Amino acid sequence: MPGFLVRILPLLLPLLLLGPTRGLRNATRRVFEIAYSQDRFLKDGQPFRYISGSIHYSRVPRFYWKDRLLKMKMAGLNTIQTYVPWNFHEPWPGQYQFSEDHDVEYFLRLAHELGLLVILRPGPYICAEWEMGGLPAWLLEKEAILLRSSDPDYLAAVDKWLGVLLPKMKPLLYQNGGPIITVQVENEYGSYFACDFDYLRFLQKRFHHHLGDDVVLFTTDGAHETFLQCGALQGLYTTVDFGPGSNITDAFQIQRKCEPKGPLINSEFYTGWLDHWGQPHSTIKTEVVASSLYDILARGASVNLYMFIGGTNFAYWNGANSPYAAQPTSYDYDAPLSEAGDLTEKYFALRNVIQKFEKVPEGPIPPSTPKFAYGKVSLEKLKTVGAALDILCPSGPIKSLYPLTFIQVKQYYGFVLYRTTLPQDCSNSTPLSSPFNGVHDRAYVAVDGIPQGVLERNRVITLNITGKTGATLDLLVENMGRVNYGAYINDFKGLVSNLTLDSNILTGWTIFPLDTEDAVRSHLGGWEHRDSGRHDEAWAHSSSNYTLPAFYVGNFSIPSGIPDLPQDTFIQFPGWTKGQVWINGFNLGRYWPARGPQLTLFVPQHILMTSAPNTITVLELERAPCSSDGPELCAVEFVDRPVIGSSQIYDHLSKPVEQRLMAPPPKKTKIRGWSMYDDESL
């Protein structure tokens, strides 16, 4: 062996043993930092500003992560921003999900492979129009817990969760060879009433403990002094958020009051806006968004476009606002990429703005995915919920003198059936009431199998019913999504207070927590063989124009002889009212064409099969189109175009803060971190 190799080998051996990635990192240290004196970021010593877009991996199937990320890169973005919803990964205490659609590490590595940097927003609270703002519902088992505070019960749960999540993130930090350049602590905390600096300091210490002292930690709050009073903390870099039409100079001056030096940052520049059931679909004009983006970039600021792709609130993951208004299944957000990942006019307009400031990648942009209209599919009614309780609640019911909440029976999402008997004769219409607005969120009411109507949070708290003494009173209660923003995120579900019948409190409840997911995946297929056809009990209906909540099932096959199938599609519900839909056991989410604005649900191709028929399961809660007195068929239809609502341009984003606070619609005017209610009721 040559002499110089003998001398140098002991020096090289430690690097060789570290492997290629770690060895390179030690040989050439990667650094991402704030250069306060230069009012900018430095990446490996060079000036840097990010142009980022928000994508929530929890709202996009893993099957499509690469497609969406590539489209974001080709738009000229150099960074993506994503939330980590705690409840998406720990839906039950101590039971963690980090595989398949929950594999956040894979998602971040994929972004890295595509040359995208990452802004990580791990909460623990995220808002995001997501169920309970990303906090797990099981936290409410401590009924007096004060969320987002230094409450010991809350801190203990947060500490345990961060101890699971953040060590997974540390190898993915930029300085460790990964894509994560900055990490947000909490989320718009200045908009929350608690104003608990001990809580923020606790988070700051735990983030540094798990991620190291050289990680860039930041906060985000609305561009108003009020929010920064409780949202900013020394040692966490303060950023602001605001939408198109805002006064950019004023907004960044607010940031400068907390951060006299350092980069200007808009962490949430709104490309669109959120929706609620029963309100028009929100859009913001492309030219308004493009013009404001140009002005932000012209100031040398870093910016994140919220959202660049919205995606879908599959299953039960949508959130809600106060006064109670649930968000729909679609989180399209009028973003540059549609819910289905399609290129829009806004995409190309914003790309044109970005390329005036930064070089955009050359080459073809991945096209919009093809869609296919599979047509109508007939569905057969199987059983009502009441007739299927042995399958839906295999462990049996819970007895209680007074009604229990979802949390008390450990049912965090979905449905619970509450049953008691009428203690008096109600041959004449008798008021069934929730005097303290205690139905959270909708209750489908029946007496001896005869539907009576619906009780609904904030909207319908009294319903006249009829029945004889001793008749069975059923209330199927639906959790429509927990409040994700504001003071009322301690959102208990079910019957959260007593019901009265003609002013008398009802007692003696039998409570059935329903495992609809397991039933749909494992058992529904067997129902058809055991008990097919229409059921007289199931089809009972009254003058209230409701039918009993029931399951419907149908099958369809992907056409043969057509290349490149299956393809994405959209399912619509002509004549149906409100419910939940599954395809091949995959919970697509809620449909509610009777209220809108969303009429179709996105169906990604990866859940469809070509080797066997595809099974559609519908749980209709109010009224199906094929009731016993009508000629209509029970059918759904697959179409190749989405219908998520009529276009409605809300002008509340372009008004001064003082005007925005009072301007409907929506009734809750929220500038992400700024909210004013005309009614603070639950």
Curated annotation (Swiss-Prot):
Gene3D superfamilies: Galactose-binding domain-like, Glycosidases. Residues 1-23 form the signal peptide. Keywords: Disulfide bond, Glycoprotein, Glycosidase, Hydrolase, Lysosome, Signal, Zymogen. The keyword Repressor does not apply. It holds the Pfam family Glyco_hydro_35. Homodimer. May form higher multimers. This is Beta-galactosidase. The gene is GLB1.
